[in-house]
Structure formats: structure tokens, C-alpha cells
Amino acid sequence: RALAAGKVVALPRVDESSRMLELKRIVDPARDIVAGYRGLPEPATRCERVAAASIDWVLVPGIAFDRMGGRLGYGGGYYDRLLPVLPSRAARVAGAFSAQIVDAVPSAPHDITMDTVVTEAGVVFARPLAR
């Protein structure tokens, strides 16, 4: 829907040398998405790079989330390095299954919490986005 509405859609691509996520614009998913890092679908290297400063919202994966927006990632640190460089106005949204919601996830001072956590059962956590 976002592409059909003329929105710029960017997906992450792993840069193995820097261990960072590059944000790449996709226009035609059938053509622009290829097997990438560890066989995961990601934008082709030829796709245009998108500046982190232009991001309005980001969908963040994880193993578990808590009801305060805490997130337990997969251990690679890719989103831990991406989230701090996004503009503060960018909404951080986690999509998860209800089984991934726990009482509390371990956290460190550098961890960035999610603004919204959504499951198949509905919104689990949301904070106002006035930034």
C-alpha cells in the first residue's frame, strides 16, 4: 500500500564489513529484493541508499518485548546501532506475536525502547509520539 501511495519505502541491508544496516529504497519488491545476508531477503546492492535522517518510522524485529516497550534483539546488535542514528521523530514500532510478550526483558542503559508494540491480538504498548 505504501508503494502504491507513492511513499518512499526503505528496507535494511546488512553491510557485513561495518556490521551496520544500510537503508535502501525499494520500488519494485519483485525486482529489488534478493537473498542477502544469511539468505534473508533484503534490497539489492544496486538500490538507492536512503539517509537515516529521512526515516519517519521503523519496524523493529526482536525475540521478545515487554509491556514498557523493552526489546530483546537477536544478538547481532544491528538495530542497537541503527536506532540511535534515526531522527528522534521516527516512530519505533515492533511487530510480534503474543507469545513474544514477556513481563520484562533485560536492558542496558544504551537500549532504546519501542514506541509501539503490536501483536496479532492488538496494541500491547504505545507511548505518545509528540517529539
Question: Locations of the language-model features?
Answer:
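Surface-exposed, charge/polar-rich loops and edge strands
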Residues: P29, A44-R49, A53-V58, D66-G70, ...
